Amino acid sequence: MKDYYCNQKFYQLKINAEKKVIYSCCRADQEHIDINWLKDNPGELFNTPNLIQERKSMLSNERIPGCENTCWSKEEKGMWSRRLQSENKEKITTLRNKPTQLDITLSSECNLSCSYCCKQYSSTWRKDIEVNGDYKGLSNHNDRYALNNFDRVLKKLSQKKRQQTTIADLVNTEIDMMADGLNSVTMTGGEPLLDHRFSDMIQKFKNTKSVVVHSGLGVSETVLRRGLDAMSDTQHKTTLCISAESIGKNFEFNRQGSNWETFLRYIDIIKEYDVAIQFTSTYSNLNITDYVKFNTMFHEY
């Protein structure tokens, strides 16, 4: 009999502050944050009625619909799933838990329009669609290449106004309440360094053992240094995980909005700070010719 248990639903939380949704595991289906419920249940963002029920179902070895597309259906085809990487890890059976692993997306603010990205992760991609219209023939890609009403609302709100909402305050309070119990934090975007809250957010995780910030370095030198100052002011070394996989003109094509020489200069600037460097690369037919060259150039990381 197949075992449908996965311990990630018991310790991992992903928050998308802009979309007002959470995920119990970064691959699970999203759940919209119920503002009224959270007001009445402070500190319980990781223990919503839905999450409690899903944990009960898992402990009863039931197949959870929220994990269908990313795990169950893939495993049935003999494919790898995220769940399989935690098969031999400790089994957690308590229903109410505090997350020990947090993945937070502050916003989709980003100055780049990378070739394999979309409006969900880049405001520049979204602006391109606003100006030039929806992409044709891509309607089956989960609304990534067409504007919806949520996008139109975002367009009207400045970053400051988005952060002055009830839901933003509630999420901020929840993060404060869970911060001390976190073992690892991952900050993604968009471009996290562009978010006005970045320095304050990093300070919430000052004592967290592992903090990883994902960046495309599509920012000004002033913004970069401000972010590096904040990342250096922590008890444990923060890691800056940089998105790149091409060199020269191909880099500038795939990372539209970037400049190769500026990118190299920024790498040297980062070395001045007490911040670790990693790279995350997307392998595709658009960068295959540079993949080996890039890895050779930055092999030390």
Please describe what each predicted stretch is:
Residues 1-89:
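Accessory C-terminal segments flanking Radical SAM cores
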Residues 10, 22, 27-29, 201-204, ...:
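Short, intrinsically disordered, charge-balanced linker/junction segments flanking boundaries
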Residues 48, 52, 89-94, 163-176:
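A Trp-anchored, charged/polar loop motif used as the substrate-binding/catalytic surface
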Residues 76, 115, 122:
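Short functional micro-motifs and their immediate structural scaffolds
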Residues 76-101, 110-112, 133:
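Recognition helices and adjacent regulatory flanks at domain boundaries
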Residues 99-109, 120-167, 179-196, 206-224, ...:
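Core AdoMet radical
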Residues 227-237, 271, 299:
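Acidic (Asp/Glu)-rich catalytic clusters
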Residues 285-299:
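Catalytic cores of alpha/beta
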